[in-house]
Amino acid sequence: MAAASSQGQVMQNTNYQQELQHAESLLAGLTTNDIPHHIHYDLTLYDREGHESTATYDIYRDPILYERTEIKAADYQLTHITNVRDHVDWQHYTGDVPLKILDFERAVILPRTAVDRFAQEPQNIKPMQMQQLEDTPLLCANDQAGTTICFSPLIHLFAYAQMFNRTIMYDQWLPIGTHSVPGSIHIYQDKKLLVEATGTVEAVSKFPDHFMQVPDAPSMPSPESQYKIIKSKSLDQSDARYGNIQVEVSVDEKGHVAKESIIDSDDKHLEGAARKFARNLVFEPRMKDGQPVPFDASIYVEYYPFFPPEDQ
């Protein structure tokens, strides 16, 4: 899925930061002048063994006021409401976040992981160049170290992102007011499909009463706030690969990991490094009735090495 260079003579902006800002100004949810809307995605997810499952992902936005996200994926169900004006968040969920939902959340609307990487290394981003992907012209920026972001020069929106062997493809952009959302998102690991998302968007004249309001019931704490890691060793990131790994750990009374197992992973090549990393974690002991007790936790490991650019 690598994009091949093109010698097209069309004059285009070659400054990545300017193109990114232009794209973000066109995306629904990233500015304050959206119209109220509802985005719905039907997801097909594939686990480490290739088993298929389905999920739905809904975003309801009343700009400047509220945003509501609902995810339904087998045993995992989430409702998250944000009072944008008062900066109040509320959530209720069941089960653990499936790994492929995490992958999708980092790619919905824009390739957040790649954008964040570029933000950490602006000095490495060269002037963008025109390239071709399956006969489609793209305007691409790369860091010479494994990460590429490509825009469609015709609509100034994201088309493609690559982090080593991870590929994210955006297509069928859908208008909503003066903004857009991707109607199609595909996430690949090497040539293996991990996530397929098909979306729709509609304007909403009025949301049901109380639908967007933060409930009086207390918000559930985030899963990661239920434990505290007090000691860790660096993750071995010597392979030029990208991927996320979900690991279940059994922690003893002293906070040491007694057992670790892979729940799901994007890339089996990375499981050994993730297990070793998890095995060496030390948690703050969990107390019950004044006594330390064992517990289980699900952790998510991101494997995204940083190598010096090839031309340095």
Label each residue range with its predicted role.
Residues A2-T56, Y60-P63, E121:
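N-terminal leader/targeting segments and the immediate start of mature chains
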Residues M11-Y16, V84-T148, P153-L157, Q162-F164, ...:
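Flexible, processing/modification-adjacent segments and terminal tails
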Residues N15, E19, S53, Y60, ...:
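N- and C-terminal low-complexity/disordered segments
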Residues I39-D42, I109-R112, P122-Q123, T167-I168, ...:
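Short Pro/Gly-enriched beta-strand edge/turn motifs at strand-loop
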Residues L43-L45, E70-A74, W90-G95, D143, ...:
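Beta-turn initiation residues at beta-strand->coil junctions
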Residues G50-S53, A73-D75, Q123, Q132-D135, ...:
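Short solvent-exposed loop/turn micro-motifs enriched in small/polar/acidic residues
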Residues I59, Y66, Y76-Q77, V84, ...:
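Charge-biased low-complexity segments
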Residues D62-R112, G177-H179, Y188-L193:
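Contiguous hydrophobic, core-forming segments of folded domains
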